[in-house]
């Protein structure tokens, strides 16, 4: 299992989500950290950033080490790629 760390902005983003969406995003992050499975893909032109798709939400993250995931921010899909 990988350790998940949140940047301060990502923690604020998560707290601002509606409760139902917040639970879905937390579950998806935890599932990805445990299994490596989820709708995640590398972002072109963004260095080593990846995104995890959770409904209408996009979780951007990087692997800091093979066993550490750093969540950068959580945005609605309309705003995620601007």
Residue map of PLM features:
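Enriched for short, Lys/Arg-rich terminal
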Residues: 1-23, 37-38, 53-57, 62-82
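A short, surface-exposed loop/turn module that caps and links secondary-structure elements
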Residues: 27-53, 81
């Amino acid at each position: 299992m990988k350790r998940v760390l949140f940047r301060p902005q990502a923690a604020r983003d998560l707290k601002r989500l509606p409760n139902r969406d917040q639970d879905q995003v937390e579950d998806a992050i935890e599932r990805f950290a445990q299994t490596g499975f989820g709708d995640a893909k590398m972002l072109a032109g963004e260095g080593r950033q990846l995104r995890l798709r959770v409904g209408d939400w996009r979780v951007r993250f990087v692997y800091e080490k093979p066993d550490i995931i750093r969540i950068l921010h959580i945005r609605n899909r309309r705003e995620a790629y601007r």
